[in-house]
């Protein structure tokens, strides 16, 4: 189970700022807007990253691994 959701949300928001992307953060959910798609992130027991068009999320326990995946999707 992930801990310190506020820290995780802050780190993901910082990543969006670094890439100059628009995002929306509400509760334990973050949506990052790319040019032609969106990335939807949900914080529950895991950090779940949903790509547009995929039903099953990428799930991570570690923030570093989730950030790596987000960077891969963004760039």
Regions of interest found by a model, annotated:
Residues 37-65, 72-75:
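Intrinsically disordered, low-complexity regulatory segments enriched in Ser/Thr/Pro
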Residues 1-33, 54-68:
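Negatively charged, low-complexity tracts enriched in Asp/Glu with abundant Ser/Thr
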């Amino acid at each position: 189970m992930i801990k310190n959701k506020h820290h995780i949300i802050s780190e993901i928001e910082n990543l969006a700022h670094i890439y100059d992307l628009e995002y929306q953060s509400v509760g334990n959910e973050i949506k990052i807007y790319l040019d032609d798609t969106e990335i939807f992130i949900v914080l529950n027991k895991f950090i779940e990253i949903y790509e547009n068009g995929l039903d099953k999320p990428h799930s991570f326990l570690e923030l570093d691994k989730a950030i790596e995946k987000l960077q891969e999707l963004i760039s």
